[in-house]
Amino acid sequence: RSEGAVILVIAEHRDGKLNRATLETVAAAQTAGGPEKIAVLGSGVDAVAAELAAADAAEVVVVDDPALEDYTADGMVLALEQLIAAEQPERVFLPHTYQARDFAPALAARINRPLVTDCVAVKDSGYVRPMFQGKLQADIAVDGPHLATFQIGSYRADAMKSGATPAPVRKAAVAIDAAKIRQKPEAPFKEAKQAVDLSQAERIVSVGRGIKAQEHLQLAEQLAQAMGAEIAASRPICDAGWLPMDRQIGSSGQTVAPKLYVALGISGAIQHRVGMLGARP
């Protein structure tokens, strides 16, 4: 890669609230040799842009358009195709969220750039990403301009460096033809009414089959309540129906990066550990 080549981080937010995974992705960009620009797309996103301006970044670039009020893959691709053409970043970083996974492949194809997904680290001229459910880690080398997504928890949100002064905020000259957006916006997907986004939790109490009996789960729930933590579990607990599947952490569940992770009765199998490797030691 070219020394000092621009990295463009694509922010993710919903209902005026910034997804913490964005801060993690900014932290990843800050370790990669920058300078970093942060792009905020949506409608009425001045508050989100101002929040991100606190980061140690070259600038925050805003694409504000009524067509982006509700998320659609087409809208994001149309806007980012123009923005990337104008800004010419060598690398585009995104959090590896459901939303980014929805539109990033189409964006990469549209602008003819390689896409490296689910990265856990920036390394030399490339990236590190897990393979075979986290049993191996591969070094991925990429030549030329490209896109990369970062696994939630691979970098810490609180590791993002703040600037001495707010970064400048600039409106980008991007025009979106709403007629080209084929999707109809719908409510964000949730697996169940009780679904919880554990990736945003700062404290988690997680239980495994080592707790032996379902009645012991109540003690863990009381501990979580006393700590102001979310309750979670390894797969055997959820498979047994002791907790709903949206509480599962691991390769087939959620990936988390809390400040405190308390594991009770969990053996530490790799399938579980890949879901909580970002937890603070």
Regions flagged by a language model, labelled:
Residues 1-281:
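N-terminal glycine-rich FAD/FM-binding segment characteristic of electron-transfer flavoproteins
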